[in-house]
Design a protein with these regions (language model features):
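Solvent-exposed N-terminal domain segments of exported/luminal and surface proteins
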Residues: 10-160
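Secretory targeting and sorting signals
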Residues: 1-8
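Internal, hydrophobic beta-strand segments that form the core of beta-sheet-rich folds
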Residues: 285-303
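Exoplasmic/lumenal beta-rich domain surfaces
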Residues: 229-277
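Short beta-strand elements
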Residues: 301-329
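Short tyrosine-centred short linear motifs in exposed loops/low-complexity segments
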Residues: 269-291
């Protein structure tokens, strides 16, 4: 029997709990269930980048893992797993000593401490043994975070702990699960722009719709829905030798969900509400036009909770070839 750092025994990409007939104790992945409630599910999609570079979701939190019966089965038939987010126990004896035979156990990380043992896995009681979860445990600098040894919580109760999950925890988690469509803008001219003549840019209505993702943590009553709403398209022509329309490069989304205005015959000399004018030809090396949609993020959750999260962006790029104006000899 051995007690080792958790990352020494591997995580294997499975989460703790019961998966089919397999019972495991791993801390690398959450048991949060994520479903997309609304929005596009087809075509090329990607995740959002937060516009707030200082924002990031919590690195870890606690989740219910085992019922008393499940812990008994795991301890007596397996016994290899993570008893905390950083500490692994190899061998059934460590598990049975602490969770069956009331033997106190060492928590080596953070502030070392002794943890009081349990009697017979708390069989007959209603509740769950909770443990720390971190999608990337190696990114956590503070070893005290979420590092309690697996602990008991009565059914229906959330731990009184600063790292206990909340609806906002789930909203933050869902933020990184939101997938939005690529920003494939319509252009006119479509294949090659001309120096000093505007290129019209637009997106038809229906291309971008709200995306809503629901996250639920089983056996807690906690849930949150994170909604991403497209609010603007930003154009970067890929060169300083260009003008954008509007000057900021930010094209607002129209009331019907479209962006910009489609080009019509006779519009060549007009200024587009959303577009670009290149001032210099490419001469063999195309400019890289980037188009990024800004998504406004809000959330609502259990208990009437809700609020705003940082806006997110998703960017795509495409080549732009620009030719000189062709002179006409008379």
């Amino acid at each position: 029997m051995t007690s080792v750092p958790a990352n020494a025994i591997g995580t294997g990409g499975t989460y703790g709990g019961v998966e089919g007939e397999e019972i495991s104790a791993e801390a690398s992945q959450s048991r949060i269930k994520v479903t997309q409630v609304s929005g596009s599910t087809g075509g090329k999609r990607g995740t959002l980048s937060s516009t707030d570079l200082n924002w990031e979701p919590p690195p870890c939190w606690y989740e219910p893992l085992f019922t008393p019966e499940q812990l008994k089965t795991f301890a007596e038939t397996n016994g290899n797993g993570q008893v905390s987010i950083r500490q692994g126990w190899i061998g059934s004896e460590l598990w049975t000593d602490h969770f069956r035979d009331e033997k106190d156990a060492n928590n080596y990380f953070g502030t070392p401490s002794m943890v009081k043992g349990y009697k017979n896995y708390n069989l007959g009681k209603k509740g769950y043994f909770w443990h720390g979860v971190a999608p990337d445990v190696n990114s956590i600098d503070d070893t005290k975070l979420c590092n309690r040894l697996m602990f008991w919580q009565n059914a229906g109760d959330i731990p009184d702990d600063p790292n206990a999950p909340t609806p906002e925890t789930l909203a933050d988690y869902a933020y990184n699960k939101v997938k939005v469509p690529e920003t494939a803008v319509e252009l006119k001219p479509a294949t090659k722009s001309t120096v000093n003549l505007p290129t019209w840019v637009w997106l038809d209505k229906g291309t971008f719709q709200e995306v809503k993702v629901r996250a639920e943590l089983p056996n807690t009553g906690l849930w949150a829905e994170t909604t991403a709403k497209p609010v603007a398209l930003h154009l970067n022509p890929g060169t300083e030798d260009a003008q954008t329309f509007p000057a900021s490069g930010d094209c607002e989304i129209n009331a019907d969900g479209s962006i910009g205005t489609p080009y019509s015959t006779g519009d060549a000399d007009k200024t587009p509400p959303c577009g670009i004018r290149y001032l210099k030809a490419t001469n063999g090396t195309p400019y890289r036009l980037s188009a990024s949609v800004t998504w406004q993020i809000t959330w609502e959750g259990a208990g009437g909770t809700g609020g705003d999260l940082p806006d997110g962006t998703f960017e795509t790029t495409q080549d732009m070839n620009v030719q000189e104006i062709q002179a006409i000899n008379r």
